[in-house]
Regions:
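Binuclear metal-dependent phosphoesterase catalytic core
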Residues: 72, 76-163
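Short, small-residue-biased leader/transition segments that mark boundaries at the very start
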Residues: 3-8
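Active-site-proximal segments of metal-dependent phosphoesterases and phosphodiesterases across multiple
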Residues: 12-59, 67-72
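Solvent-exposed serine/threonine-rich low-complexity stretches and specific carbohydrate-binding patches
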Residues: 166-182
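Substrate-binding cleft of secreted/luminal carbohydrate-active enzymes
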Residues: 62-67, 101-105
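Active-site-proximal beta-strand elements of phosphoester/diester hydrolases
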Residues: 1, 18-22, 77-83
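Flexible, glycine-rich phosphate/dinucleotide-binding loops
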Residues: 26-27, 88, 167
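Outer-membrane beta-barrel proteins
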Residues: 30, 125-127, 171
Length: 182
């Protein structure tokens, strides 16, 4: 309650709203099209709705990388659930969704976030996906390439190319599985 009162008292002095807490306030529910609010997150966001500023939430806890745009008509809210620097504890290099063990670096210019980048301990090019040949073949005997995408966002455009040519969507299949490395 004291923290909520502090937010109410200090809201007139802010130019950018970044809320950092341990557990995610919102998450994608695999069976739903919108995130499920947790606890009293909406009550806290209501403190800032008259500011007309975008709200950024930083969270962790789940050992996954996830970005959620919170569906509110009165304000713009994005929550970034960060992967964990220790991975999934028992398997250091990776988190539960296959995201690398990492921390996230944010760059600011004034009140604007100019860049968000994962800093991991393996491949610096491995920002949002890992591509590898799983050794499997399809029904026609052609090799199958597996791709794990983490921290995806519904506004992203996903395009797969083979030797420079776009692969038809009919040849792509989305699956919810653990990363092969995990």
């Amino acid at each position: 309650r004291r923290q909520r009162q502090m937010c109410i008292r200090d809201r007139s002095d802010v130019e950018r709203i970044v809320i950092a807490w341990h557990c995610p306030a919102f998450r994608r529910n695999p069976g739903a099209s919108s995130p499920n609010p947790m606890d009293n997150a909406d009550e806290l966001l209501d403190i800032y709705k008259d500011k007309q500023l975008p709200v950024t939430i930083w969270s962790g806890h789940n050992h996954i990388a996830e970005t959620v745009t919170v569906p509110r008509s009165d304000m713009s809210v994005t929550e970034y659930t960060h992967p964990c620097v220790c991975g999934a504890w028992w398997y250091f290099p990776l988190c539960h969704d296959g995201a690398p063990a990492t921390f996230t670096r944010y760059d600011f210019s004034g009140g604007t976030i100019t860049e968000r980048r994962s800093v991991n301990f393996s491949d610096s090019d491995e920002q949002y996906c890992r591509v590898y040949n799983s050794g499997l073949k399809n029904a026609e005997g052609r090799p199958v390439v597996r791709l794990n995408v983490w921290d995806w966002h519904p506004t992203w455009k996903f395009e797969c190319r083979e030797n420079g040519a776009a692969v038809p969507a009919s040849q792509l299949k989305a699956v919810r599985e653990y990363d092969d490395y995990y």
